[in-house]
A protein has these predicted regions:
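Intracellular loop-helix junctions on the cytosolic face of multi-pass helical membrane proteins
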Residues: 15, 19-37, 157, 185-318, ...
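Central cavity-lining transmembrane alpha-helices of secondary-active solute carriers
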Residues: 80-97, 342, 346-351
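Intracellular juxtamembrane helix-capping segments at the cytosolic ends
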Residues: 142-156
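Hydrophobic core of transmembrane alpha-helices in multi-pass small-molecule transporters
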Residues: 128-143
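Glycine-rich segments within core transmembrane alpha-helices of 12-TM secondary carriers
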Residues: 163-181, 188, 203
Length: 351
């Protein structure tokens, strides 16, 4: 009886593995209902990552003024440099994912680096702050652009349900932003900064565990674009990306500390980004595809303009809230920076 049970168990395992191997992009995209099940997995992963990101973003300027004893204008400049590097490295991380790593490996690597960055700050907030920030910049650059790309691949190109899928996905972003923006500043100001940054690390661990447990359901979505290449050559390229990214951490640390250098880097990355866009545009050949890419670039341009204004909420508006807002509202005590960090995401969810 024991032998027979073992055989049946092994057979079930083989069948399960076989089913996992057989899942195709067509099977994923031909789902019934409004949302594919894979969307909920990515929703959860992104929710925890945005908790981490918006939690960190909401405390940066306040922490630099309160704990590192920087003046308001110096803290605001360094916050701007940090955010500039975050957006610059999403461009770089997206290229590496698209050309070498694939979305899955890029996302996992980015998550690990973000966790390390938060842990560095958690265990030595004053001493390791800028090193931890450098890790977080690299991690966000590899994580953020790639999970959104995987959501798009859950649908056929002309599937009318794609908009609803992205709407639900961005609801997860706002839920994570609401929770992280409120909880991290509360933990830091009223309990300990170690607990604040540790909470950000813990939720990222939860997000990565969710991803590891569910990535098999994504099938070929997010796999390396170099699967046809011999494994040894592919591994060399992947390791080069990992090592090169980590070796850039002292460079980022120096740029964030010395904000004058940041401008030169941003001018350089801006020229490189435009050059890369022109290169990809000419490579397409077909006019219809070129028009789509130009349209996408237009949206990206206005997205950057929007974020240049929106990110003031983590910098100058954070300082304004700290110094000018009343913490009493209708008899309730609410920290001004909890309101500043979370009001946008709250109203997006409500509306």
């Amino acid at each position: 009886h024991f032998i027979e049970t073992t055989k049946q168990s092994n057979a079930r395992k083989r069948n399960s593995l076989s089913m996992e191997k057989q899942i195709t992009i067509e099977e994923i995209q031909n789902f019934e209902g409004k949302y594919p099940k894979q969307l909920w997995y990515l929703f959860t992963v992104e929710m925890w990552e945005r908790f981490c990101f918006y939690g960190m973003r909401g405390v940066l300027t306040f922490f630099m003024v309160d704990q590192l004893l920087l003046k308001d204008d110096a803290a605001n400049l360094q916050y701007g440099a940090i955010q500039a590097f975050v957006y610059a490295f999403t461009f770089i991380g997206g290229i590496f994912a698209d050309k070498i790593l694939g979305f899955k490996k890029s996302l996992f690597f980015g998550g690990i680096v973000m966790i390390l960055g938060n842990l560095l700050i958690a265990f030595a907030p004053q001493q390791m702050f800028y090193y931890g920030i450098a890790f977080s910049i690299i991690g966000t650059g590899f994580f953020k652009p790639n999970i959104s790309s995987m959501v798009g691949e859950l649908y056929h190109e002309k599937d009318p349900r794609r908009d609803a899928g992205y709407g639900m996905f961005y609801a997860g972003i706002n839920i994570g932003g609401l929770l992280g923006g409120a909880l991290c500043i509360y933990l830091g100001k009223y309990h300990s900064w170690t607990l604040c940054f540790l909470a950000a690390a813990i939720v990222m661990v939860a997000g990565l565990i969710t991803f590891l447990l569910t990535k098999k359901h994504l099938g070929p979505i997010g796999d390396s674009p170099l699967l046809a290449m011999p494994e040894s050559k592919r591994k060399i390229r992947e390791i080069a990306v990992y090592v090169g990214s980590l070796l850039s951490i002292p460079f980022i640390y120096t740029m964030v500390i010395n904000t004058d250098y940041t401008d030169y880097f941003m001018y350089t990355i801006g020229i490189v980004a435009i050059g890369y866009f022109v290169f990809e545009l000419l490579k397409l050949g077909e006019i219809s595809l070129q028009k789509k890419l130009i349209a996408a670039f237009s949206f990206i341009f206005f997205y950057f303009l929007f974020n240049a204004i929106y990110e003031q909420s983590g910098g100058s508006l954070s300082l304004f809230a700290k110094d000018n807002l009343n913490s009493n509202l209708l008899g309730f005590t609410i920290d001004p920076n909890v309101v500043n960090n979370s009001s946008n995401t709250f109203f997006v969810i409500v509306l």
